[in-house]
């Protein structure tokens, strides 16, 4: 298996798609990488020569923030917002949606599973 930024990319897929398995590389960055290194996006990973793989690896390592570095940067950004007390930091701290989504209904991913709250008791029959 070919490795890029410490991630094994699948051999059977097209290079353009296989590169998206690396955290921080989506379709657009994948296409830009292949254009810069002169590799055909439709080539399968198993058909890449060693020189092409090395060129892709070097381009990604030198020009794109990926995997651990990117994760650390995102976590640092969130921590900074929480510390300086911005609205977004407050939303992160409370575990609510950060980007203005509604919370009256939905937002279950951020809020977690529903917790039952005792409603109004019905008067019992005597």
UniProtKB/Swiss-Prot annotation:
Highest rank taxon of the organism: Bacteria
Q: Name one GO molecular function term.
A: rRNA binding
Region described as Disordered: spans on this chain: 91-126
The protein's matches in InterPro entries, at most eight in alphabetical order, are given as: Rbsml_uS13_C, Ribosomal_uS13, Ribosomal_uS13-like_H2TH, Ribosomal_uS13_bac-type, Ribosomal_uS13_CS
What keywords appear on the UniProt entry? Ribonucleoprotein, Ribosomal protein, RNA-binding, rRNA-binding, tRNA-binding
The Basic residues compositionally biased stretches are 108-126
Its GO CC terms?
cytosol; small ribosomal subunit
GO annotation, biological process: translation
Q: Which residues form a coiled coil?
A: none
General function of this protein: Located at the top of the head of the 30S subunit, it contacts several helices of the 16S rRNA. In the 70S ribosome it contacts the 23S rRNA (bridge B1a) and protein L5 of the 50S subunit (bridge B1b), connecting the 2 subunits; these bridges are implicated in subunit movement. Contacts the tRNAs in the A and P-sites.
How does this protein assemble? Part of the 30S ribosomal subunit. Forms a loose heterodimer with protein S19. Forms two bridges to the 50S subunit in the 70S ribosome.
The family classification in the record reads: Belongs to the universal ribosomal protein uS13 family.
Protein name per Swiss-Prot or TrEMBL: Small ribosomal subunit protein uS13
- List the source organism: Streptomyces coelicolor (strain ATCC BAA-471 / A3(2) / M145)
